[in-house]
From Swiss-Prot:
<comment type="pathway">
    <text>Metabolic intermediate biosynthesis; 1-deoxy-D-xylulose 5-phosphate biosynthesis; 1-deoxy-D-xylulose 5-phosphate from D-glyceraldehyde 3-phosphate and pyruvate: step 1/1.</text>
</comment>
<dbReference type="GO" id="GO:0030976">
    <property type="term" value="F:thiamine pyrophosphate binding"/>
</dbReference>
<feature type="binding site">
    <location>
        <position position="181"/>
    </location>
    <ligand>
        <name>Mg(2+)</name>
    </ligand>
</feature>
<dbReference type="InterPro" id="IPR009014">
    <property type="entry name" value="Transketo_C/PFOR_II"/>
</dbReference>
<dbReference type="Pfam" id="PF02780">
    <property type="entry name" value="Transketolase_C"/>
</dbReference>
<dbReference type="Pfam" id="PF13292">
    <property type="entry name" value="DXP_synthase_N"/>
</dbReference>
<keyword id="KW-0808">Transferase</keyword>
<keyword id="KW-0460">Magnesium</keyword>
<feature type="binding site">
    <location>
        <begin position="121"/>
        <end position="123"/>
    </location>
    <ligand>
        <name>thiamine diphosphate</name>
    </ligand>
</feature>
<dbReference type="InterPro" id="IPR049557">
    <property type="entry name" value="Transketolase_CS"/>
</dbReference>
<keyword id="KW-0786">Thiamine pyrophosphate</keyword>
<feature type="binding site">
    <location>
        <position position="370"/>
    </location>
    <ligand>
        <name>thiamine diphosphate</name>
    </ligand>
</feature>
<comment type="subunit">
    <text>Homodimer.</text>
</comment>
<feature type="binding site">
    <location>
        <position position="80"/>
    </location>
    <ligand>
        <name>thiamine diphosphate</name>
    </ligand>
</feature>
<feature type="binding site">
    <location>
        <position position="181"/>
    </location>
    <ligand>
        <name>thiamine diphosphate</name>
    </ligand>
</feature>
<keyword id="KW-0414">Isoprene biosynthesis</keyword>
<dbReference type="GO" id="GO:0000287">
    <property type="term" value="F:magnesium ion binding"/>
</dbReference>
Length: 620
């Protein structure tokens, strides 16, 4: 969309942070209002992450106004909240392309802008990176400042606390801003907090604080009195704080929607030495009432009419694979009170809302703590329960050692329901489920299943749930199922595939939900089509049968070719000294950018047309 100068006259003056810093402070509330309206106008037309950005408008303006970005380095955790940052840093007119193929990256991205210091997408990385950047800046000696912005969800992760513990030890000059949008601010408490925050962050208080510590450090009774006095003053703002114990100078909480107050506090804190912590309170979805009332629904939105206040309803067609999983989970839990379900902050995305309501005592949202989720499941299994870890493929990477050390080595019966496997679409490189088959396949005695449709998905979940000799995994994609009939649940024979149709010369061995595309290719080329079902253990007898009765084999999977299911087929053939030619079709050896699933599959040759072209070129 073209930028309407008449509609956004103040925002029109700001196409860089240098231009922002030329504005008089008095114009900044108006700028924030226009920025929020422009964000609503843009995202409603193009889709994208929405509610988080509405909540960080004032913070973004204040940070870029006070700090000399991009020389001073501003780091956003996760990046859902960074749309206003992109708008103010030279990407205003392109914001309508965000998350689209060839458009702006969905998150801060180093290759996109010098203002994007750290490429992000996964949670809780900002403080660790910020410490490294601050240490490097200190050694550089150019008085470059470092600021990390992290949300109240992301800061619950262990990695964030590991980083803060380290910062308290080495004491780099840096600021961590906690964007806390869990509750709204009482006007009276907020006003008191803002006044005291400015007092406590001011030079006079800081000088007295540090000077007093030095003068009286050798006099234990006075040192203790000073400590208690300071704690009493701070108790008016917040009654004790973990962040002070970790070594940070804590200020807050303050109103994150008071842009002028934020500027005063940030200016006071800018020159303080050592690790600083500013706690701000914001409202997710601020300025757009429907998003304020339902920030979860409006977290990421499709195109919608902002005047209606409603998101478009789904067409009511085929269920998603997440819904298939959620329904199976409820069905199984109703029959077995040993079932326990775990998710690391992905209740809605993983299809677990209904389960959490029906079985609240068997539902565990452990927050953004993938490592804990897996080892917690191990403990439940040791205790005689049947844990299921529902997790996105890209986030299971964060708990790899726990899968190995705490589950697999001990042969514990934990079922991993791996959602968002394969190409996920608009979230791009950081969220593609490209690697799970590769990193799980090498784990001894792990059972790994790849359903070709929703009925197989249910049967495999049932099979994995009743597998008691070790861990198992079922991986399924983002998006809708294909519409096959759901049959009664029964256990599948472990490690056995099935031949779907017989052809000549060429056999296609399919792993997973690319089956409809593979079926079209098999029909066009008169090829045998096999639903392999299991990546581990592989159906070696079936692979050898196909090798003996065909001139060439093709493997198909929506996972990295390197180390994936096709690599496993190659290993079987080489181990048995079978000289048959094999073409492995899957995800290539680079990080796949954003675009719709259909766009990226077509570009990568993973639709029927692309597969057939690859096979014909290979056979020529």
């Amino acid at each position: 969309m073209s930028f309407d100068i008449a509609k956004y006259p103040t925002l029109a003056l700001v196409d860089s942070t240098q231009e922002l810093r030329l504005l008089p402070k008095e114009s900044l509330p108006k700028l924030c209002d226009e920025l929020r309206r422009y964000l609503l106008d843009s995202v409603s037309r193009s889709s994208g992450h929405f509610a988080s950005g509405l909540g960080t408008v004032e913070l973004t303006v204040a940070l870029h106004y006070v700090y000399n970005t991009p020389f001073d380095q501003l780091i956003w955790d996760v990046g859902h909240q960074a749309y206003p940052h992109k708008i103010l840093t030279g990407r205003r007119d392109k914001i309508g392309t965000i998350r689209q193929k060839g458009g702006l990256h969905p998150f801060p991205w180093r290759g996109e802008s010098e203002y994007d210091v750290l490429s992000v997408g996964h949670s809780s990385t900002s403080i660790s990176a910020g410490i490294g950047i601050a240490v490097a800046a200190e050694k550089e000696g150019k008085n470059r400042r470092t600021v990390c912005v992290i949300g109240d969800g992301a800061i619950t992760a262990g990695m964030a606390f590991e980083a803060m513990n380290h910062a308290g030890d080495i004491r780099p000059d840096m600021l961590v801003v906690l964007n806390d949008n869990e509750m709204s601010i009482s006007e009276n408490v907020g006003a008191l907090n803002n006044h005291l925050a400015q007092l406590l962050s001011g030079k006079l208080y800081s000088s007295l604080r540090e000077g007093g510590k030095k003068v009286f450090s050798g006099v234990p009774p006075i040192k203790e009195l000073l400590k208690r006095t300071e704690e009493h003053i701070k108790g008016m703002v917040v009654p004790g704080t973990l962040f002070e114990e970790l070594g940070f100078n804590y200020i807050g909480p303050v109103d994150g929607h008071d842009v002028l107050g934020l500027i005063t506090t940030l200016k006071n804190m800018r020159d303080l030495k050592g690790p600083q912590f500013l706690h701000i309170m914001t409202k997710k979805g601020r300025g757009y009432e429907p998003a304020e009332k339902d920030p979860i629904t409006f977290h990421a939105v499709p195109k919608f009419d902002p005047s209606s206040g409603c998101l478009p309803k789904s067409s009511g067609g085929l269920p998603s694979y997440s819904k298939i999983f959620g329904d199976w989970l409820c069905e199984t839990a109703a029959k077995d009170n040993k079932l326990m379900a775990i998710t690391p902050a992905m209740r809605e995305g993983s299809g677990m809302v209904e389960f959490s309501r029906k079985f609240p005592d068997r539902y565990f949202d452990v927050a953004i703590a993938e490592q804990h989720a897996v080892t917690f499941a191990a403990g439940l299994a040791i205790g005689g329960y049947k844990p299921i870890v529902a997790i996105y493929s890209t986030f299971l990477q964060r708990a790899y050692d726990q899968v190995l050390h705490d589950v697999a080595i001990q042969k514990l019966p934990v079922l991993f329901a791996i959602d968002r496997a394969g190409i996920v679409g608009a979230d791009g490189q950081t969220h593609q489920g490209a690697f799970d088959l590769s990193y799980l396949r090498c784990i001894p005695e792990m059972v790994i299943m790849t359903p070709s449709d929703e009925n197989e998905c249910r049967q495999m979940l049932y099979t994995g749930y009743h597998y008691n000799d070790g861990p198992s995994a079922v991986r399924y994609p983002r998006g809708n199922a294909v519409g096959v009939e759901l049959t009664p649940l029964e256990k599948l024979p472990i490690g056995k595939g099935i031949v779907k149709c017989r052809g000549e010369k060429l056999a296609i061995l399919n792993f997973g939900t690319l089956m409809p595309e593979a079926a079209k290719v098999a029909e066009s080329l008169n090829a045998t089509l096999v639903d392999m079902r299991f990546v581990k253990p592989l159906d070696e007898a079936l692979i050898l049968e196909m090798a003996a009765s065909h001139e060439a084999l093709v493997t198909v999977e929506e996972n990295a070719i390197m180390g994936g299911a096709g690599s496993g087929v190659n290993e079987v053939l080489m181990a048995h000294r079978k000289p048959v030619s094999v073409l492995n079709i899957g995800l290539p050896d680079f990080f796949i950018p954003q675009g719709t699933q259909e766009e990226m599959r077509a570009e990568l040759g993973l639709d029927a047309t692309g597969m057939e072209a690859k096979i014909k070129a290979w056979l020529a």
